[in-house]
């Protein structure tokens, strides 16, 4: 890593929202971040094409959220629900943008969630996702994993704050995307007296040691320190455990 990477500026932030409480929390955090960075906030609501296709199946059923009753999954009712959710998201984004005095836009797309997110991420500097949503934790876990590994911009996985100081976990493997994620994390944590943890992804101890030295030297040049963990195999469950131990946000 070199000093030029530290000059990267976040001017456009994409936040994907599905009207769940945790995604609204991510929206609020994104608005705060956009205000502090004088960045534009882009809200994205995705109508899941797989869910809509399932609703067209004669065998599709849904369980009432409160009553627990089982009924046919009606595609027309589902589309009305999706439109209603999108309106709620847009209204909340408008309120937050007005309160935070930030530029914003909102878009509704229909398609596969991973593909739509990756497409929207192609022209932004940071992507923010809530930790849960889009039909539950399992769906978000695979979505976040796909976006984080393939998106050209760093992806921040947000959860509601549990401490007074921000905590960010960076997954670092030395790649260009990982370097951008470390740069973004450093920019977010500077001046906030927060906590930074770096999960080193490596094939062996020698590579892990080299990557830790590389990251530590770069962070020290910005008067930052971090806590390090070495991982030699990574799956979704390991990342989830790290998130629960290390901090509220993961890059």
What are these regions (language model features)?
Residues 104-107, 133-136, 174, 228-232:
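Short, flexible loop segments at the rims of nucleotide/cofactor-binding pockets, characterized by
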Residues 78-85, 89, 109:
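Active-site beta->alpha loop and helix N-cap motifs at the rims of alpha/beta catalytic domains
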Residues 1-3, 9, 21-23, 27-29, ...:
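Gly/Ser-rich helix-loop-strand patches that form or flank binding pockets
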Residues 108-115, 231-237:
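Charged docking surfaces used in two-component/phosphorelay signaling
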Residues 70-80:
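Short glycine/proline- and acidic residue-enriched helix-loop micro-motifs
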Residues 2-72, 163-232, 249:
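Small/aliphatic-rich secondary-structure junction motif
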Residues 97-105, 220-227:
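A short helix-to-beta-strand connector/capping loop
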């Amino acid at each position: 890593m070199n000093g030029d990477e530290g000059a990267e500026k976040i001017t456009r932030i994409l936040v994907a929202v599905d009207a769940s409480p945790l995604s609204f929390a991510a929206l609020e955090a994104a608005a705060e971040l956009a205000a502090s960075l004088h960045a534009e906030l882009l809200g994205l609501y995705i109508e899941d094409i797989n869910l809509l296709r399932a609703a067209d199946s004669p065998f599709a059923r849904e369980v009432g959220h409160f009553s627990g009753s089982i009924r046919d999954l009606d595609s027309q009712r589902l589309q009305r629900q999706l439109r209603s959710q999108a309106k709620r998201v847009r209204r909340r984004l408008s309120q937050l943008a007005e309160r935070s005095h930030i530029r914003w836009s909102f878009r509704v797309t229909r398609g596969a969630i991973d593909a739509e997110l990756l497409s929207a991420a192609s022209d932004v500097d940071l992507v923010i996702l809530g930790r849960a949503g889009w039909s539950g934790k399992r769906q978000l876990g695979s979505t976040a994993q796909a976006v984080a590994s393939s998106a050209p911009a760093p992806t921040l996985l947000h959860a509601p704050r549990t401490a007074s100081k921000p905590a960010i976990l960076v997954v670092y493997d030395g790649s260009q995307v990982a370097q951008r994620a470390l740069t973004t994390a450093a920019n977010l944590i500077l001046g906030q007296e927060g906590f930074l943890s770096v999960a080193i992804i490596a094939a062996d101890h020698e590579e892990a040691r080299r990557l830790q030295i590389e990251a530590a030297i770069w962070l020290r040049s910005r008067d930052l320190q971090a806590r390090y963990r070495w991982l030699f195999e990574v799956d979704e469950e390991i990342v989830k455990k790290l998130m629960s131990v290390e901090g509220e946000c993961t890059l």
